[in-house]
Design a protein with these regions (language model features):
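Extended amphipathic ligand-handling, pore-lining, and cofactor/metal-binding catalytic surfaces
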Residues: 1-175, 180-182
């Protein structure tokens, strides 16, 4: 067994929502591929044609790193995924709050919604805040809006697209440095 230390999964934060990088692109592609597969679609485009939006719910933070969520939304757009939306359970940044995301999905005209955590571990936030039966869960709020024909939840962590935890770590770990190299 070994321990590897890697860069953050989403790479550098950057200064504003337009700063994206190869790490964000790789994560965006991986999570959308997996979400489509689980939902029975061949691609994000096929899901969009069927009227399905995917909402990826992250944690959120009041730290300046919260721009990462807007950067992920920018990355989804750059990939052409008009049916991918980024939200946060803590509602920070504000445009990622549940009610804001509901409005965006509704305004975009999608009638089917798939909620999925944008978290390494699918724990309490995924099971309760996203998929729970309480009226304040994301699922309940999307349903209560009356704007959607269906709201489904995929309670799977962002790391689930890797077969083992070691593959997840290795996928984002920097290659070992050569002797004499930092």
């Amino acid at each position: 067994e070994s321990v590897a230390i890697a860069e953050p999964m989403l790479g550098e934060v950057g200064d504003d929502a337009t700063v994206i990088n190869d790490d964000k692109k790789a994560v965006a592609q991986a999570i959308t591929d997996e979400a489509c597969k689980v939902a029975g679609y061949d691609s994000m485009e096929a899901a969009a044609e069927d009227g399905t939006a995917f909402v990826f719910m992250g944690h959120g933070t009041s730290h300046t790193a919260n721009v990462t969520y807007d950067q992920m939304q920018t990355q989804m757009g750059d990939l052409g995924f008009t049916n991918a939306f980024i939200g946060t359970v803590e509602g920070e940044p504000e445009d990622t709050a549940c009610e804001e995301v509901i409005a965006k999905v509704k305004d975009a005209g999608f009638k089917k919604v798939v909620l999925r955590p944008l978290m390494v571990v699918a724990g309490d936030h995924a099971n309760n805040d996203m998929a729970g039966d309480d009226e304040d869960s994301w699922k309940s709020q999307f349903e209560a809006s009356g704007a959607f024909d269906s709201v489904d939840c995929q309670v799977r962590a962002a790391s689930s697209f890797f077969q083992t935890p070691s593959r997840a770590m290795n996928a984002f770990a920097a290659p070992p440095s050569s002797p004499g190299q930092p």
